[in-house]
Amino acid sequence: MAGAKEIRSKIASIKSTQKITSAMEKVAVSKMRKAQQRMAAGRPYAERIRQVIGHLAKANPEYRHSFMVERDVKRVGYIVVTSDRGLCGGLNINLFKALLKSLKEWRDQKVEADFCVVGTKGASFFRSNGGNVVAAISKLGEEPSINDLIGSVKVVLDAYAEGRIDRLYLVSNKFVNTMTQKPEVQQLLPLAASDAQGVQKGLWDYVYEPDAQQLLDALLVRYIESQVYQSVVENSACEQAARMIAMKNATDNAGDLIKDLQLVYNKARQAAITQEISEIVGGAAAV
């Protein structure tokens, strides 16, 4: 029964792992729902800022902030949003593939890049593969704050304002639904025309304090910060959804493996019993 003992031990080990993956799946479901709530709560804020920026830009057409002006691209910047932990399927790998595809398009034009990295997995990726990382932040926790991101985002915004980079992209995962998370490379700067114009019909002519141009300068920075924050929150929802699916698959696979091993165990046990009976019968016949 030595073979049967080993199989029984494997079954016990897999059952133990199955309990862990099942528990992790349930935790991921709970965390995903909380992240979805934060994601939904942040959208109206970013949308309202975009509308105010559009109104200010329309009211002051002669003023063009550097964040709104196209220029020749000599160097680009990427804000890359990744997870802090693994066990979330191909979430980060697919994101890196999208990043590398965009990066290749620019490098084919002899344009190099700087990176601002959010998340431990992103930091590990650039340590292994190289890249000029100018800012990095990780371990934001389950409830990130926009204040945690301001310092890192300021580094790349200053680089853009000073002309050290000429275009800024945000690379993150978009939450399509529980089963689908899609990596996306979104241009942050210069602002696309739709972002800069906002909603232009049926607006009152407001009086702004302080000066409208000063307010526009501050809001543009705040808008970019809110976009990055929203992406971090959305990426967190994507991470938990991907982990939930990965843990469910692991739990199901463990169940299938237990069934297969149970069948092998039963066959081994039956073979051992048959052998013992044969030995007893053989011994009796010899007597």
Curated annotation (Swiss-Prot):
GO molecular function (one): ATP binding
Alphabetized InterPro entries for the sequence: ATP_synth_F1_ATPase_gsu, ATP_synth_F1_gsu, ATP_synth_F1_gsu_CS
Membrane topology: Peripheral membrane protein
Keyword Ion transport: yes
An example Gene Ontology CC term for this record: proton-transporting ATP synthase complex
A GO BP annotation: proton motive force-driven plasma membrane ATP synthesis
Record keyword Repressor present: no
Protein name: ATP synthase gamma chain
Protein species of origin: Ectopseudomonas mendocina (strain ymp)
